[in-house]
Amino acid sequence: MFPHPMLYLLKHQLFQKDRSLLFFVSFTELAGKLQVDQTVIQRYIKLLEDNFILFRLQALRKNLRTEVGKTRKIYFWDIGIRNILIQNTNTLEYRDDHGKLWENFCVSERMKYLRYHNLQPIQSFFWRTYSQKEIDYIEENQGLYRAFEFKWSPKKQGKLPADFIDAYSNPEFVTVNPENFGEVLYQI
């Protein structure tokens, strides 16, 4: 057993070997690595959520055999906390984790916007298949889906996987980059 499982969880288990945030989290796997019960991990994560350190997104799933269902993505409300934990406070030109930083920033800003405007009917998810097809962030409101793909480079365009289009009829889709994020993230 580790002396401070929560600190170990934050510093070593939520991050991959390359020091970038491990978005996809399995409580069972973390519990095994930390040699604690899975409920301990869940309580630690809940405590960090209750103190506005991080938050989770659940997977969107229509019970298709190809969709990941029990995995969650974990994001930090404040990217500065993430940077301190991985001991990397360098400016962007000296970093290799632009994509993960950008995704965390965009998802957290969108979630803050939705909470501030009390838009509770909107539910937030991510989507992923076992064959690694993924959508970074999805909002569902009264049966309508809006999918977001976050790209650091304005030259790159995201694309909706055909599996998603087939399963979730007529979704709206937008690629968010540094040039358009204000127009996209801060609107209803």
Over which residues does each language-model region extend?
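A cross-kingdom feature that marks ATP-driven nucleic-acid transaction machinery
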Residues: 43-53, 57-188
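Conserved helicase/translocase motor-coupling segment
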Residues: 1-47
